[in-house]
Amino acid sequence: MSLSGPRIGRAHQQQGDTMAINVEPALSPHLVVDDAASAIDFYVKAFDAVELGRVPGPDGKLIHAALRINGFTVMLNDDVPQMCGGKSMTPTSLGGTPVTIHLTVTDVDAKFQRALNAGATVVTALEDQLWGDRYGVVADPFGHHWSLGQPVREVNMDEIQAAMSSQGDG
């Protein structure tokens, strides 16, 4: 069993006396939070996450968990400073996060509201953007930022550049 992503549920191939693991390249965010169990509950409520599994350490803190959000794997664990050179790695302890996790969704208004109802706060209000998406950003209760966007109109690069240029005229 793997809690690392796309190979979950994939068939393995027999090679001699050993099983070869069928690995598919992937990119998955791995979030560090205070209270990973509560974070899992939040992500289920806010983003309709499906829990793939969790691994508690001897003290009950989660040393690893995996979720499926919007069709992709997101991994997370409780903050374990001793695994990071003695440093806490949560967004709260670091004074914020430079990373925003983006979800392209359908019915962005409902999904944005669902995240707010689950306890997220607005970072950037949901609005139609010059690049053609209806887009907004929320912060989860654990300090991670999530942008939600839905393409609502086709635009070309000339339109985007013209819109950017006109923003300076004012």
From Swiss-Prot:
UniProt xrefs under Gene3D superfamilies: 3.30.720.110, 3.30.720.120
Cited Pfam families: Glyoxalase
CDD domains for the chain: VOC_like (cd07246)
InterPro entries attached to this UniProt entry: Glyas_Bleomycin-R_OHBP_Dase, Glyas_Fos-R_dOase_dom, VOC
Residue ranges of domain VOC in the record: 25-151
PROSITE patterns: VOC
PANTHER family listed in its UniProt record: BNAUNNG04460D PROTEIN-RELATED, VOC DOMAIN-CONTAINING PROTEIN
Protein name: Uncharacterized protein MT0910
